[in-house]
Structure formats: structure tokens, C-alpha cells
Curated annotation (Swiss-Prot):
Contains one covalently linked phytochromobilin chromophore. PANTHER family: OS08G0260000 PROTEIN (PTHR47876), PHYTOCHROME 1 (PTHR47876:SF3). Belongs to the phytochrome family. Coiled coil: none annotated. GO terms for biological process: detection of visible light; red, far-red light phototransduction; regulation of DNA-templated transcription. Regulatory photoreceptor which exists in two forms that are reversibly interconvertible by light: the Pr form that absorbs maximally in the red region of the spectrum and the Pfr form that absorbs maximally in the far-red region. Photoconversion of Pr to Pfr induces an array of morphogenic responses, whereas reconversion of Pfr to Pr cancels the induction of those responses. Pfr controls the expression of a number of nuclear genes including those encoding the small subunit of ribulose-bisphosphate carboxylase, chlorophyll A/B binding protein, protochlorophyllide reductase, rRNA, etc. InterPro entries: GAF, GAF-like_dom_sf, HATPase_C_sf, His_kinase_dom, PAS, PAS-like_dom_sf, PAS_2, PAS_fold. One of its GO terms (molecular function) is photoreceptor activity. Residues 906-1123 form the Histidine kinase domain. This is Phytochrome A. Residues 217-399 form the GAF domain. Keywords: Chromophore, Photoreceptor protein, Receptor, Repeat, Sensory transduction, Transcription, Transcription regulation. Homodimer.
Length: 1129
């Protein structure tokens, strides 16, 4: 199937996105060139429209233009005058380039600070260390020795001549070290130590607000983010921008000071944020413009340098003139922008490293505007960057939730497809409800079948539709269909004549002459701006660059386009295409399908039975292994039922608490825990019984017997819901870790005020892995247990930055798996440093030997004797080998159950389609004359097919077992039900040479009754099947039926049926009989079948009994039905 735009191709989304961005970069270059050439006469709106058209329809003659544009972006030599810049050779510390304002800012003499000797001169070749005080020079020299110098930003330095403080922000580029110097304002308390933790403190309140938000609402998340940034930074306006799939943007949240025009709901063209700028946002997560009206300072470079310096990574890099003009037009004099970067689900970069690296994607921006010049110090900008990273993690989680909703929509669509197929194919999809418009979101749909057009909703006229078919036949001959969001861009000549009603189209061919169409109107019709009500032209010149002009230009660009067709929508359309093709081909070959009815049914039965046997056997094996592990485990394991009564208590938990197993069983769990833990346990049980499983929750048990005088037992538990056979929660199982000794040590740490080294460095195996930092984030503790766990010696890590150097994602000692893990670690450390109670979190890293260590991390503040915070202690809790094995078995069990569930769900859905085909063939065969014997066989086949359908529909076994199933009542002949049931065991009974004897009168079997015939048929077939399986070769099977009538007044006549199925042999095992009567919790394949059948019989006001006699056994099945003849009278 073809697509008119590469960006819409579903075959390779990553490659398509890349191609689209190349096109957009060309458009960006053209607009930039137009602006530079036109100056004040630049017409923004028309430029966007013209370049959009040219970019997509003309040959690329602008390679030179694009190259020049990108060179201009990367090699610009201007900075903002709020600070200055130096480029330094790392080996000699000599200056290679400097901004024109650097000498004045860094070497100007201050009369308030006395100086001795000659004043340093700043120029090409000057040693940068001579400009600053000795401690500052030493700090710069130390920073150069770091592999990742960004970890040390900002570096506080003081000028030698003036004594003025500056923040030095350094980064490496090819051939030099670029250092931005930003003055520390007089009102600002300078940050005396570098490191992320110092900056993270500034954003702690905002981070906590985001962390506390419940999931499920992207709107609430964005609103909270802009509000927190608004309060944190003090800008006049804060907005959240989201980039859509076609790269156009939308303001999804906004907070402003009173009196400012709102921009909420604004959409703007993709070219408003150029692709080059987006690329830079992936590298530099925060961008500040202090004053768009200030004159930029040029950077002077050593003419002897063999290369050009790039300032892309500079915090002071000057904005481009086009952007400055845009800012001034909207009266935004200063801005601060934070990038929201997430993993790109469409692109994965393969790596030979221990991890594959997912490429990053710019989801959107958080943008701050101010109506007057504004400077934000680097520490606060660093805090904003951290906040944006936390926000990005939550955005990713919300997107995952949205993807789950999409998956549910796909399941809904698959159900709808089966429903559509049950109709008169293919006309039923347009003549009945639901119809083909319900399959995907659209404004209209049409079916071209046998040269006749059937239309639904907003569609082209019959003449226009046939014109589209002619165009498809001429230009897309080899394609089975086409999807486009713009018929105009796809090259359809009559697109403009269709107007706004039809812009996008998806079409598929059923046959060479029959087609399905879906249509969408223009995207602008669905877009509303939530800003001020005034028309753009009333207040603004549409030619100028302004948000309203952007919105107007965007509407102009998308007026011939619809919303794009999602990949899952096209999958649904393709599925319907394939199903209809099959249905139409079946119609042409009805005669050849007669024998296929029985074979398809047998195949489905065989697959279901094989799957059921395999799944139950595998689950039984895993269950047995789990029971053995629990009984012999050296970790505490206990369990409760749905009433919170203890029904599991292994040896280890009995040993720890002093409460024997026999005394613990039957007690309420809340009576066994300390009063201080009751609230925690109640909350934990409530979640677990709802199926919401929690991990790493601490609480305390009381002690009994010989341990009654001991301290309470502290455990950390993982709670997992115990589920019954039908996936209902029947209890909770707790796998625990005894942390009493660890808690004792931690309590001792919080009380200690002197020398703690004797505890931390103690090689006792009871001491857990411990590491710590000072208040600035430098590693100050690393005990022996941590050395053994990580492979890094104490002397290797001491005085290194914990975030970045020790735990990081690039050149760190202990490699973390993802940026998200790094940000989460920063959040935990920040919470501990600010004195907040932090719960244990899952923490993982790679040791030196490549082993992946998984553990729980608990961070707590370290206090000085006077109570001041001096750093952080971190404790790691490792799962024992037995617990790890138990958790591994648990994961395997869950994976096996999920695999079986998915397979059964898939098989159920797939079985529907051939059954629908069989149903279609049956209807055609009914139109063909058949003999009497053929008719009897045909009717038996029909009943068996309906039986299979009913089995596939009866997936809610809980309703059957609990007696809530609604029976489907209809008239039927007892003979038909019996023959259909008997036919299902005939092949097996013949194969075992079993003599089957029927004992009933033909007159009785011809009775017409009223009840649920299919479920009665299922019951009889199940009991007959069990008997045939247990009857030995050459054995005997007798089936007798008796019928008695009971008059209830004149209008109702009840019929009592009794079936006796007698078989020779050993009989049904006692376990299966117990399972049939529900007295055994364990359920085998045979047992569940008997249990469900007995429950169905109970719904028919009957029951099942099983009698054992010498050499034979009998099932006695009684049901109560109504006589159809009396009912009619």
C-alpha cells in the first residue's frame, strides 16, 4: 500500500521521520535566507506558505543554501553581552579566542580592591590562569583533569584585578576548551561548590510536586509543570509546547501574569522552531536569552588556528536575528527555554556495548517569556534542567498509558471487524450499524462494489469518487491501496474542487474493481485557539513574525490537509481488506467448501485441547516448584486469604517471630503486626487485594514465645496478589527480607554524633553496602561491602562526584542503564539532603565485572553534632539467593501465565474468522437442495459449529461458577441436541471399539423443548467425552434418557429430563470427582471440565451424581426444562 507522503509510511517510521526533517531543514534555510535578504520588508506569512509549497513540489536546488544556513547556525561568532567567553588550549592554558567584552569584564581594575604589581593583559596567547586568583586558577586546572568537565559546572572564580566573582561554565569542543563567564550578581549568594546536588536543592519543591501527581492526565502534568516553573523562575509567561507527529507545535499549558495576551491552544508551523534549533536543544537542554535588544559581542579568534570554533554549546551563544525579531514583535524581551527530551520509540541505535542505546526525541519545550530583560543565574538554570528531566520521565509514562489505550482501541477494532464480517459481506458494512465508519476516526466512508457506490457521511459525489478511482488506476496501478493526509499534495488534480470536506483519504482494493474508502476533512477545522477572541488582523500585521501570524500561517499550510492516518488505524483497514477478500473468494467457491466445515472445527478443537493440556501441565510443574521453594526458603514468606486470615507461614518467619506455624495459621494478620505498622499493612492489603502489587514496603512484626522480649522484627516485603484459576484475586503472598539488624544500624547512625568509621568500615557481613557524600555531592564514604559489590576500591572513588563520575551513563565507574535511572537517583539524593523521608527505591548498576546488580536503595541525611546536614548516607539492600530464585520463579510463572493468556486470546479471535466463513458457507449450502441423509449430517454439523461458537464466547468462567450466567432460551428438538453431542465422541468410541447402547424411545426424543440447547449439548458432550476416555478398549457405554412431565397450571408444563451415562472400567478418579463438586482447590483439566458442566446443569435447576458399582460407573444428570407445545398454547 502506497503513501503519498514519506512521513506517513508505516514500514519504517524512523527513516520516514528523518526524511521529513531533511525537507523541513531545507524550508528553514529558505525562510532564513528570505529574512536576511528582505530585512524590514520580510513577509512572514507568505514566506511560510510559499516555502511549504516549494519545498515539497520543486527539485532540490537549495543544497548550497542549506549548507550555508547550517554553517551559519554552527559557526556563529557572536555572544550575549551579559557575560564573556574564552577559548583555551587545554594543554598550555593559553587563550585561542575571546569575546570582545572579555578584557573589560575580567581585567578591569576595581578601585575597591587593592592590587599589587602589573595588571594582567587579556589577549591571544595569554595564560588564562594569570587572570584569576591563585585558588581560582587551581580550580580551573583541576577541572581540566576531569573526563566529563560538565559535572563540575559552575566553577566559582575571582578576577585577580577586581576581585569580582564569576561562574565559569566550561565545555569541550574539537581543539579547545570553551569557558563562559557569567557574573555573580551582588544580591546573589554565590555557590561555593560545584555539583548537581547544590542546584537540585533549588528545584526540590517543584520535583516533589511532580512526583506526587497521580498518573493518567497529560493535561494535569503540563499544568503543574508550567505553574512550578512560573513560581521557580519568576518569568511573566510560562508555556508548555508540544511537537506533533508532523513537527508542528501547540501550546498545551500556560501561566501568565495578569494583563498578558494568552497563547494557550496556539498551533504554529513546524518552521517556527527550525530543525537546527531542535537539534541544539537535544544537546543543550536549557537556553537563555537575557535581552533581545542588546547588541551582541563578537568573538575574536586566533587567525593562525587551522579550524573554526563552534559556539553551539555555549550558554552565552547569541540568538539569530530572525528569532530576535520574532521576540521583539511579541514583546518578549527575555526568554528561558527547557527541552523535554524522551526516548524515541521509533528509532533504536544498535550498540555493541552491554546496552543498546535508544535515540532521543524532542517531545516539546517549556518556554518562559519576560517583558523586560531578565538574567537567570546558572545554578537556577541547572535546577530547571533537572526539573525538565523529571518532567520528561513523567511525560514518557503518560505516553505509555496513551499507548495502552491505543492497544485497547485495537482490540475494540478487532471485535468490530468480526462483527462486520457476520453481516452480508460486503454490503453489511455500509447498510447496518455499526458500519465501516466506526472502524477508524473519519468524516465519511464509501464502498465501490460491482460498479455501484455506497456512501456514508461526508464524501465526494459519485462522479468525483469515480474520478478518484480513475486517478488511482492511472497513477497507482500496482498498489493495493493508498493513504494520504492531503489529496492535493498527493497529486490528485481534482483535490481543490473537493473543498474542505475531503482532504485526506485512505483507500484499499478488495478486488481489482471493488474498493473501500475513508475520508477526512481538513485539519484546521478541528483546531481551536484558546487565546484572545480578537481576529489576528485587527491587532497585528500578518506579515510580521508573531504568534498570531504563526497561527494564521499554520492554518494556511494545513487547509488542504487532514489529520494523519495512524499506524494502528491502517492496520485495522488492512485487516478488513483481507477479511472481505477472503469472504468474497469463499462465495465463489461454495461447492468446494463442504468438507471444510468439519475439518476446521476439528482443527480448532485440537488446538484448544493441546493448548489447555500444555498450559495446565506447565503451570502444575511451576506450582509444585513454588511450594517446595516456599517451604524450604531461608527468607520469610507468609500469605493471607481474601479475608486477611493467615493461610501460609513458612519456617523462617516462624523462627524470626517465635510464633509456630500451627499457632499463626487462622489468625488475622493485623493481630500479628506492631500497632505502629497497622496502617501500612491495611493499605498494603487493600492494594494487593485489588491486584495492585507493591514492593519494598517495611513494617514490624510482634515477637512471641522465647523471642517475646526481643525487639520487633522489621521486614521489607514484596506483596503479590494470589490469583485463582480464573485470574480472580483470592489472597496475598508476601516475600520478605529481614532487615532488623540493618534498622538497628541505621538507628545507631541517626543517634551517633562522633566517630562512625568503626561501624561503616566494619567488615562484618551484617553490615550492608554503604556509601555516602558530603553536602556538595562528593563521595565521602565507601565501605568494604560496597567494594565487594561494585568491584571499585575505596581509594578509587573517594572525592569523586557521586552523580556523574561514580554513578552515571557514560564514562562513570558504575554504569547506569538509562538517563531515567540517573535522574531518579538525583531525586532520591536531593530528597535526603533536604531532610525529606525517602522510601526505598529499586536501584541497579553494572559492576566492574559486567554483572548487573539489582538492589534497594535507602538514602538518609548525615547530621553534624549541632544538627546541621553534612551529607548523605546510602544503604543498599540486596535480595538473598533464595529470594532472588523465588522472585525469578514468580516472574517465570507470570510470564508463562501471560503467554498462555495471550495465546488463548489470539486463538479465540482467530477462530472466529474461519467460523464466520463456515457460517457463510452454511447459509449458501442451505440454498442448495440436499438429500435426507445429507440434510441430517448438515444439521449435526451446524449444531457442532454453534457449539464451538458458544465455547469461544463463554470466557467468563467466574460467572458460570458463581451462577450468574444468563441462559439463552430457545426452542429445540431433544433429538438434535443428543445427536450433536453423540457425534463429538463417535470417532474416539469407534477407535477404541467401544459398544455404545442407546436406551430411549424415538417418540420421546422427538419432543420439542424450551431451554438453552447449546449449553445442554455442551454438558452432554463433556460427560460423554469423559466416559469414553475412561472406558477401556472393547468396553461398554450405555446412554439412557427418561422424560417426565409436570403441569404447572394451564400455561406452563415442566419437563424433567434424566440422562444416565454408564461406562465400564475403573471410573473417574476421586480427585476429579472432588473437583467437580468444588471440594478440592486443585483443578486438573478433567476436573475443570466436570466442574463447569455441573455448574451449567445447576443453572438448569438440575444436578449431577456419580455412582460407582462393581466394574462400572454412572453419571446421573438431571435438568428441568419447559415443553414448547404448552408454552405456545
Amino acid at each position: 500500500m502506497s503513501s503519498s507522503r514519506p512521513a506517513n509510511s508505516s514500514s519504517n517510521p524512523g527513516r520516514a521521520n528523518q526524511n521529513a526533517r531533511v525537507v523541513l531543514t531545507t524550508l528553514d534555510a529558505k525562510i532564513h535566507a528570505d529574512f536576511e535578504e528582505s530585512g524590514n520588508s520580510f513577509d512572514y506569512s507568505s514566506s511560510v506558505r510559499v516555502t511549504s509549497a516549494v519545498g515539497e513540489n520543486s527539485s532540490i536546488q537549495s543544497n548550497k543554501l542549506t549548507t550555508a544556513y547550517l554553517h551559519h547556525i554552527q559557526k556563529g561568532k557572536l555572544i550575549q553581552p551579559v557575560g564573556c567567553l574564552l577559548a583555551v588550549d587545554e594543554k598550555s592554558f593559553k587563550i585561542m579566542a575571546y569575546s570582545e567584552n572579555a578584557p573589560e569584564m575580567l581585567t578591569m581594575v576595581s578601585h575597591a580592591v587593592p592590587s599589587v604589581g602589573e595588571h594582567p593583559v587579556l589577549g591571544i596567547g595569554t595564560d588564562v590562569r594569570t587572570i584569576f586568583t591563585a585558588p581560582s586558577a587551581a580550580a580551573l586546572q583541576k577541572a581540566v583533569g576531569f573526563t566529563d568537565i560538565n559535572l563540575l559546572n559552575p566553577i566559582l572564580v575571582h578576577c585577580k584585578t577586581s576581585g569580582k566573582p564569576f561562574y565559569a561554565i566550561a565545555h569541550r569542543v574539537t581543539g579547545s576548551l570553551i569557558i563562559d563567564f557569567e557574573p555573580v550578581k551582588p544580591y546573589e549568594v554565590p555557590m561555593t561548590a560545584a555539583g548537581a546536588l547544590q542546584s537540585y536543592k533549588l528545584a526540590s519543591k517543584a520535583v516533589n510536586r511532580l512526583q506526587a501527581l497521580p498518573g493518567g492526565s497529560m493535561e494535569r502534568l503540563c499544568d503543574t509543570m508550567v505553574q512550578e516553573v512560573f513560581e521557580l523562575t519568576g518569568y511573566d509567561r510560562v508555556m508548555a509546547y508540544k511537537f506533533h507527529d508532523d513537527d508542528h507545535g501547540e501550546v498545551t499549558a500556560e501561566v501568565t501574569k495578569p494583563g498578558l495576551e494568552p497563547y494557550f491552544g496556539l498551533h504554529y508551523p513546524a518552521t517556527d522552531v527550525p530543525q537546527a534549533a531542535r537539534f541544539l536543544f537535544l544537546k543543550n537542554k536549557v537556553r537563555m536569552i537575557c535581552d533581545c535588544r542588546a547588541n551582541s559581542a563578537p568573538v575574536l579568534q586566533d587567525e593562525k588556528l587551522p579550524f573554526e570554533l563552534t559556539l553551539c554549546g555555549s550558554t552565552l551563544r547569541a540568538p539569530h536575528s530572525c528569532h530576535l525579531q520574532y521576540m521583539e514583535n511579541m514583546n518578549s524581551i527575555a526568554s528561558l527555554v527547557m527541552a523535554v527530551v524522551i526516548n524515541d520509540s521509533d528509532e533504536v541505535v544498535e550498540s555493541s556495548d552491554r546496552n543498546s542505546v535508544k535515540s532521543k526525541k524532542l517531545w516539546g519545550l517549556v518556554v518562559c517569556h519576560n517583558t523586560s530583560p531578565r538574567f537567570v543565574p546558572f545554578p537556577l538554570r541547572y535546577a530547571c534542567e533537572f526539573l525538565a528531566q523529571v518532567f520528561a520521565i513523567h511525560v514518557s509514562k503518560e505516553l505509555e498509558l496513551e499507548n495502552q489505550i491505543v492497544e485497547k482501541n485495537i482490540l475494540r477494532t478487532q471485535t468490530l471487524l468480526c462483527d462486520l464480517l457476520m453481516r452480508d459481506a460486503p454490503l453489511g458494512i455500509v447498510s447496518q450499524s455499526p458500519n465501516m465508519m466506526d472502524l477508524v476516526k473519519c468524516d465519511g466512508a464509501a464502498l465501490l462494489y460491482k460498479n455501484k457506490v455506497y456512501r456514508l457521511g461526508a464524501t465526494p459525489s459519485d462522479y468525483q469518487l469515480r474520478d478518484i478511482v480513475s486517478w488511482l488506476t492511472e497513477y497507482h496501478t500496482d498498489s493495493t491501496g493508498l493513504s494520504t493526509d492531503s489529496l492535493y499534495d498527493a497529486g490528485y488534480p481534482g483535490a481543490l474542487a473537493l473543498g474542505d470536506v475531503v482532504c485526506g483519504m485512505a483507500v484499499v482494493k478488495i478486488t481489482s474493481h471493488d474498493m473501500l474508502f475513508w475520508f477526512r476533512s481538513h485539519a484546521a477545522g478541528h483546531i481551536r485557539w484558546g487565546g484572545a477572541k480578537a481576529e489576528p488582523d485587527e491587532n497585528h500585521d500578518g506579515r510580521k513574525m508573531h504568534p498570531r501570524s504563526s497561527f494564521k500561517a499554520f492554518l494556511e499550510v494545513v487547509k488542504t490537509r487532514s489529520t494523519t492516518w495512524k499506524e494502528f488505524e491502517m492496520d485495522a483497514i488492512h485487516s478488513l481488506q483481507l477479511i472481505l477478500r477472503k469472504a468474497l473468494s469463499v462465495e465463489k467457491a461454495v461447492a468446494a467448501q463442504g468438507d471444510e466445515i468439519r475439518s476446521n472445527t476439528d482443527v480448532i478443537h485440537t488446538k484448544l485441547n493441546d493448548l489447555k493440556i500444555e498450559g495446565i501441565q506447565e503451570l502444575e510443574a511451576v506450582t509444585s516448584e513454588m511450594v517446595r521453594l516456599i517451604e524450604t526458603a531461608t527468607v520469610p514468606i507468609f500469605a493471607v486469604d481474601a479475608d486477611e486470615i493467615v493461610n501460609g507461614w513458612n519456617t523462617k518467619i516462624a523462627e524470626l517471630t517465635g510464633l509456630p506455624v500451627d499457632q499463626a495459621m487462622g489468625k488475622h494478620l493485623l493481630t500479628l503486626v506492631e500497632d505502629s505498622s497497622v496502617g501500612t499493612v491495611v493499605f498494603l492489603l487493600a492494594l494487593a487485594l485489588q491486584g495492585k502489587e507493591e514492593q519494598g514496603i517495611p513494617f514490624e512484626f510482634k515477637t512471641y514465645g522465647s523471642r517475646e522480649d526481643s525487639v520487633p522484627i522489621t521486614v521489607v516485603v514484596n506483596a503479590c496478589a494470589t490469583r485463582g484459576l480464573h485470574d480472580n484475586v483470592v489472597g496475598v503472598c508476601f516475600v520478605a527480607q529481614d532487615v532488623t539488624s540493618q534498622k538497628t544500624i541505621m538507628d545507631k547512625f541517626t543517634r551517633i554524633q562522633g566517630d562512625y568509621k568503626a561501624i561503616v568500615q566494619n567488615p562484618n557481613p551484617l553490615i550492608p553496602p554503604i556509601f555516602g557524600t558530603d553536602e556538595f555531592g562528593w563521595c565521602s564514604e565507601w565501605n568494604q561491602a560496597m567494594t565487594e559489590l561494585s568491584g571499585w576500591r575505596r581509594e578509587d572513588v573517594m572525592n569523586k562526584m557521586l552523580l556523574g563520575e561514580i554513578f552515571g551513563i557514560q564514562t562513570s565507574c558504575c554504569h547506569l542503564k538509562s538517563k531515567e535511572a540517573f535522574v531518579n537517583l538525583g531525586v532520591v539524593l536531593n530528597n535526603a539532603l533536604t531532610g525529606q523521608i525517602s522510601e526505598k527505591i529499586c536501584f541497579s548498576f553494572f559492576a566492574t565485572d559486567g554483572k548487573y546488580v539489582e538492589c534497594l536503595l535507602c538514602a538518609s541525611k548525615k547530621l553534624h553534632g549541632e544538627g546541621t546536614v553534612t551529607g548523605i548516607f546510602c544503604f543498599l539492600q540486596l535480595a538473598s539467593q533464595e529470594l532472588q530464585q523465588a522472585l525469578h520463579i514468580q516472574r517465570l510463572t507470570e510470564q508463562t501465565a501471560m503467554k498462555r493468556l495471550k495465546t488463548l486470546s489470539y486463538l479465540r479471535r482467530q477462530a472466529k474468522n474461519p467460523l464466520c466463513g463456515i457460517n457463510f458457507v452454511r447459509e449458501k449450502l442451505e440454498e442448495i437442495g440436499m438429500g435426507e441423509e445429507q440434510t441430517k449430517l448438515f444439521r449435526t454439523s451446524v449444531h457442532c459449529q454453534r457449539h464451538v461458537n458458544k465455547i469461544l464466547d463463554d470466557t467468563d468462567l467466574d460467572s458460570i461458577i458463581d451462577g450468574y450466567l444468563d441462559l439463552e432460551m430457545s426452542e429445540f428438538r431433544l433429538h438434535d441436541v443428543y445427536v450433536a453431542s453423540r457425534s463429538q465422541v463417535s470417532m474416539r468410541s469407534n477407535g477404541k471399539a467401544i459398544q455404545v447402547v442407546d436406551n430411549f424411545s424415538e417418540e420421546m426424543m422427538s419432543e420439542t423443548l424450551y431451554g438453552d440447547s447449546l449449553r445442554l449439548q455442551k454438558v452432554l458432550a463433556d460427560f460423554m467425552s469423559v466416559c469414553v476416555n475412561l472406558t477401556p478398549v472393547g468396553g461398554h457405554l450405555g446412554i439412557s434418557v427418561t422424560l417426565t412431565e409436570d403441569n404447572l397450571g394451564q400455561s406452563v408444563q415442566l419437563v424433567h429430563l434424566e440422562f444416565r451415562i454408564t461406562h465400564t472400567g475403573a471410573g473417574v478418579p476421586e480427585e476429579a470427582v472432588s473437583q467437580m463438586f468444588g471440594s478440592d482447590s486443585e483443578t486438573s483439566e478433567e476436573g475443570i471440565s466436570l466442574l463447569i458442566s455441573r455448574k451449567l446443569v445447576k443453572l438448569m435447576n438440575g444436578d449431577v451424581h456419580y455412582l460407582r458399582e462393581a466394574g462400572k460407573s454412572t453419571f446421573i444428570i438431571t435438568v428441568e426444562l419447559a415443553a414448547a407445545s404448552k408454552r405456545e398454547s
